[in-house]
C-alpha cells in the first residue's frame, strides 16, 4: 500500500530493531525508521561483525576484535573496549553487555555497562576448561540482572554440559561469583540459551529443550526430549519455536511451538525454504525472499502469498494486518485483506 525508495549497499545485513530497521556490515551500521527516514549511522571497521539485540537496544562487536558498539534507535549509547579478543556477546535492554573473551590461559566472561565509553568491566569472571568448561552460549536477561551461561566440558572421556545462572542484583551479591543456580547434563551439547522475558529462559541442546522460571534464581520447570536434528530456534516473550528436519518425509521441516511454561502447544509441517520465523502477537510469520505464510499460533493459515520483489526483512507493526518489507531498493508496507 506504500513504498519508499532506499539505497542499500550490497553485503549489508538487515535486522528489526524494535520496529526500526538496523543495517550493518563490515564498514558500519545505520538505522532507519519503518518509513525509510534515516535516524543515524556509524562507521567502523570489522572483519566479522556479531550482533545481539534485546528490545530496542543492540550491541555490535567484531569476532576476534576488541570493540563493541552499543546502540538504540537514537544512536550510539557507548563504546566498549574489551582489551581481549571477543568470542561472543549478549546485550540487555538496559545496555549492559556480557562478552566472552579469549585470554591465552583461560576464557573470560566480562560484563560491561555499555551506556558510556568504557574499557572497565563491572563484573569479571575467569573460566578455566578443567573447572567449569568452555562457555559456548551466553545470554543476559532483558533487565540485565541475570546472566545465563552454557558451559561444555569433557569429563573423563564423556561430554558434559552445564547451565549456570548468575545474579547481579541483591540476591546474587552474597553468593560466590554471583552464582545462584545451575544444572548439569551428560552426553549433550547446549549451544543455545535465551531469555524470553525477565522471569523465563530456555535452552536447546542436541536432544532436548529445557525451560527455566524465576526472576532471581531460575529453576527448571519443563523439559522435552527429541530425536530429530535441530535446524533453528526462534522466540518472542511468550513462545519458543524449534525447527527440525521432518523425519516422516511428509514435509521438509517440522516446527514445534512451546508456551513460556514449557508446554508444547502445536506442531506444524513446513515445506518452505524459510529465511526467518517470527512470533508476533498470536501469529507465526514464516517467510523467505519470495513468499510468506502467516498462521495463528495453532497453525491455521491467515495468509499465504508471494512478494512482488525479493524481501530481505519483514517487520511486524502494531497492527496484526500490516507489515513492513525491506527489499533491495525500497521499504514497502504490506496490508493483509
What are these regions (language model features)?
Residues 6-56, 62-63, 259:
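Extracytoplasmic/periplasmic/luminal assembly and interaction segments
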Amino acid at each position: 500500500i506504500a513504498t519508499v525508495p532506499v539505497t542499500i549497499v550490497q553485503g549489508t545485513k538487515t535486522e528489526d530493531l524494535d520496529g526500526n530497521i538496523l543495517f550493518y556490515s563490515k564498514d558500519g551500521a545505520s538505522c532507519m525508521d519503518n518509513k525509510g527516514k534515516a535516524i543515524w549511522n556509524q562507521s567502523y571497521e570489522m572483519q566479522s561483525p556479531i550482533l545481539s539485540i534485546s528490545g530496542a537496544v543492540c550491541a555490535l562487536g567484531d569476532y576476534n576484535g576488541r570493540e563493541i558498539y552499543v546502540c538504540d534507535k537514537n544512536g550510539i549509547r557507548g563504546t566498549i573496549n574489551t582489551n581481549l579478543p571477543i568470542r561472543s556477546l549478549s546485550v540487555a535492554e538496559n545496555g549492559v553487555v556480557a562478552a566472552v573473551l579469549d585470554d591465552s590461559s583461560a576464557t573470560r566472561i566480562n560484563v560491561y555497562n555499555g551506556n558510556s565509553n568504557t574499557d572497565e568491566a563491572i563484573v569479571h569472571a575467569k573460566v578455566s576448561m578443567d573447572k567449569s568448561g568452555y562457555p559456548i552460549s551466553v545470554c543476559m536477561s532483558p533487565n540485565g540482572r541475570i546472566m545465563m551461561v552454557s558451559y561444555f566440558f569433557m569429563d573423563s572421556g564423556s561430554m558434559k554440559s552445564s547451565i549456570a545462572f548468575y545474579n547481579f542484583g541483591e540476591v546474587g551479591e552474597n553468593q560466590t561469583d554471583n552464582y545462584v543456580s545451575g544444572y548439569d547434563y551428560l552426553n549433550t551439547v547446549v549451544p543455545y540459551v535465551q531469555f524470553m522475558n525477565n522471569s523465563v529462559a530456555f535452552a536447546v541442546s542436541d536432544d532436548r529443550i529445557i525451560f527455566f522460571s524465576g526472576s532471581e534464581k531460575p529453576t527448571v520447570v519443563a523439559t522435552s526430549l527429541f530425536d530429530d536434528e535441530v535446524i533453528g530456534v526462534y522466540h518472542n516473550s511468550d513462545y519458543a519455536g524449534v525447527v527440525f528436519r521432518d523425519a516422516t518425509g511428509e514435509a521438509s521441516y517440522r516446527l514445534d511451538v512451546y508456551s513460556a511454561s514449557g508446554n508444547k502447544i502445536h506442531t506444524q509441517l513446513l515445506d518452505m525454504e524459510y529465511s526467518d520465523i517470527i512470533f508476533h502477537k498470536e501469529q507465526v510469520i514464516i517467510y523467505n525472499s519470495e513468499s510468506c505464510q502467516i498462521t495463528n499460533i495453532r497453525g491455521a493459515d491467515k495468509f499465504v502469498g508471494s512478494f512482488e520483489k525479493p524481501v530481505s526483512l519483514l517487520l511486524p507493526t502494531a497492527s496484526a494486518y500490516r507489515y513492513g518489507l525491506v527489499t533491495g531498493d525500497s521499504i514497502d508496507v504490506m496490508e493483509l485483506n
